[in-house]
From Swiss-Prot:
Gene3D superfamilies tied to this protein: Metallocarboxypeptidase-like, Zn peptidases
Propeptide stretches in the record: 18-112
Entry-linked PANTHER family: PROTEASE FAMILY M14 CARBOXYPEPTIDASE A,B, SLL0236 PROTEIN
Family stated for the protein in its record: Belongs to the peptidase M14 family.
One Gene Ontology biological process: proteolysis
GO CC terms, sorted: extracellular region
The name this protein goes by in its record: Probable metallocarboxypeptidase A
Catalytic residues as annotated in Swiss-Prot or TrEMBL: E385
Location(s), subcellular: Secreted
Length: 422
């Protein structure tokens, strides 16, 4: 393998995307301001007055504000927050991104092993890796082109089964990278796919899980946005679908599902990172994913859906749209969340908080978890925010990929064992 810069790794697919010059974050800082009752309104005003981007916006006291500050605003920002406690997440965001995006180029046909998880990778290399991984286990897996993104990219999936054969068991569905900048989710979902395949008939717990469930893993739910983060803007979140009569492209795919679509947990502003779209379910990729989930459900049903995100170290249950409503299966969701968090922590000591989405992180409208539970009638619908809690945020160093994969696999195995046991 040879080291190359991500900007040289342009996708080989021919797509109808406009060329956008790479955004340079050199000199930008990411600063955390913990909020309290006496400063949360002022922090909100500072963000608005200086027109600053945030990784985490403080909607109420006690929440952290993770703020991206450009070089031109650093002096004004530091003056405004004088006297407040702060934590420096990235002294130079551009340098952090350059360190993170020194990819290891992947040679197609390579026998996948743990070395894949020592680096982040280009979109095209992910496609090659997934096909090579499946090629090692042809009798109990398939690589699936699940559909096309708005710009024509493949939405890849791995379908894994055990002794009962293909489509013979209730399904488990894992989604990663619905938000383009959350690269660790791509790698962790692939780590689980690699483990389910390579450890079958070697690890008793994994063998039992694969024999009891039909497993579908979609590591890159939002391929256009993901590719855009690698060539143009590392911190892009949405898809790349144009919005009529608006200068800002993209919708937040996790605000676009057609259930409880309108509310304070999403935005009607096309320039917002949480823009819900013009109509419920109008995202190209959402149409693909809904069609796939319905097709999977038509076999033996869906036992569990998990949407993997970053960052925050959280494992959460429905609902996102309401902070007071609870599903009838709330107790079971909470029990499994605790099992996941306890088993995960036992690996590297990483603490996770658990609870309903709205109460644990923030209110969300039009999200995948609520849609899967209430519309598709998935039995168990959950979501995670992977490492970290904000020391590095979305730009997580590559040396955290393997430990993130190890602990997430342990939590997932423990949780699925509990599902099997009933």
């Amino acid at each position: 393998m040879r080291s190359v810069l991500s900007l040289a790794l342009l996708a080989a697919n021919v797509v109808t995307a406009a060329v956008v010059a790479p955004f340079d974050y050199s000199g930008y800082k990411v600063i955390r301001v913990p909020t309290q009752k006496d400063n949360v309104k002022e922090v909100q005003r500072i963000i608005t007055d200086l027109n600053l981007d945030t990784w985490k916006y403080p909607k109420s006291e006690g929440q952290n504000a993770d703020i991206v500050v450009p070089p031109s605003q650093i002096s004004s920002f530091m003056e405004r927050i004088s006297g407040m406690n702060i934590e420096m997440m990235h002294e130079d965001l551009g340098l952090s991104i350059r360190n993170e995006t020194s990819f290891e180029a992947y040679s197609a046909g390579y026998a996948p092993d743990i070395n894949w998880f020592k680096s982040y990778h280009s979109y095209q290399d992910h496609l090659s890796y997934l096909q090579d991984l499946q090629g090692l286990f042809r009798t109990r897996s398939e690589y699936v082109d699940a559909g096309k993104s708005h710009e024509g990219r493949t939405i890849p999936a791995l379908h894994i089964w055990g002794s009962g054969g293909k489509n013979s068991k209730p399904a488990i569905i894992f989604h990663g990278t619905i938000h383009a900048r959350e690269w660790i989710t791509t790698m962790v979902t692939e780590y689980m796919a690699w483990s389910f395949l390579s450890q079958y008939n070697k690890n008793a717990d994994i063998t039992s899980i694969v024999d009891n469930f039909d497993i579908w893993i979609f590591p890159i739910v939002n391929p256009d946005g993901f590719a855009f983060t690698q060539t143009s803007n590392r911190l892009w979140r949405k898809n790349r679908q144009p919005n009529p009569n608006a200068r800002c492209p993209g919708r937040d795919l996790n605000r676009n599902y057609p259930y409880q679509w309108v509310g304070p947990g999403s935005s009607s502003n096309p320039c917002s990172d949480t823009y819900r779209g013009a109509q419920p379910g109008d995202g190209t990729e959402i149409k693909v994913h809904i069609a796939n989930m319905k097709k999977i459900a038509a076999n033996k049903g869906i036992a569990m859906f998990v949407d993997w995100h970053s960052y925050g170290q959280l494992f959460m249950s429905p609902y996102g749209y309401s902070c007071t409503a609870r599903p009838p299966t709330d107790a079971r969701h909470q029990e499994l969340s605790r099992i996941f968090a306890q088993a995960l922590k036992a690996v590297h000591g990483t603490p996770y908080k658990t609870g309903p989405i709205c109460n644990t992180i923030y209110q969300v409208n039009g999200d995948s978890v609520d849609y899967a539970l209430e519309v598709l009638k998935v039995k168990l619908s959950l979501t995670a925010e992977l490492r970290d809690t904000g020391a590095r945020g979305f730009v997580l160093p590559a040396d955290q990929i393997i430990p993130s994969g190890e602990e997430t696999l342990a939590g997932t195995v423990a949780m699925l064992k509990a599902v099997i046991q009933g």
